[in-house]
A protein has these predicted regions:
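C-terminal active-site/capping subdomain that shapes the small-molecule cofactor and substrate pocket
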Residues: 55-170
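Active-site-lining helix/loop region of Rossmann-like oxidoreductase modules
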Residues: 1-90
Length: 170
């Protein structure tokens, strides 16, 4: 522990920087133009799962000192203005999604809360201040049970279906 806190990595570490008491803005291997393999994976898997080959996705993967779970800060841009209440309701009604969204009461999903759980947890649901067509939300899920890209895609699909007035089969 002292070695970790002193920011010394042993020769056996697979990480580029110490993880203990740290946040590292890198996950995966180096790819073109400064992207990591994990960031490209989020983009490619989201496109594949949604069946939208030209879906615009940009992700920055960050390693944080948690045992398990993936968390995402999602910035979803839509063609039309978003109704936050309708988006929240769509998420509440979605199978395998649990909404915990009372930040004023200290209620929002965290990795500690979701370990060992099957559902995807969503909170901090809000409209971007300067962009009425943009929804901001925080997503957590146990990645040993369900992958991050699938979670992101399913949530985006549900919100998109609600915004367009359609329904989702997910």
């Amino acid at each position: 522990v002292r070695r970790m806190i002193a920011n010394k990595l042993g020769d056996e570490s697979p990480f580029q920087a110490p993880l203990a008491l740290n946040v590292v803005p890198w996950a995966g291997s180096v790819k073109d133009d400064g992207w990591s393999s994990e960031e490209l994976k989020v983009r490619n898997e989201s496109r594949k799962i949604l069946g939208i080959p030209d879906l615009k996705v940009s992700a920055t993967c960050v390693r944080v000192p948690v045992v398990t779970t993936h968390s995402l800060a999602v910035h979803a841009v839509f063609e039309r203005d978003i109704d936050v209440d309708a988006a929240r309701q769509a998420l509440i009604e979605a199978p395998s999604v649990v909404v915990i969204d009372e930040p004023g009461e200290g209620e929002f999903p965290t990795p500690v809360d979701v370990v060992g759980s099957d559902p995807t947890f969503v909170g901090r649901i809000r409209q971007a201040l300067d962009f009425p067509n943009t929804l901001e939300l925080f997503v957590c899920g146990d990645n040993l049970r369900k992958g991050a890209a699938l979670n992101t895609a399913q949530i985006a699909e549900l919100v998109a279906a609600e915004v367009s007035g359609g329904s989702s089969d997910s």
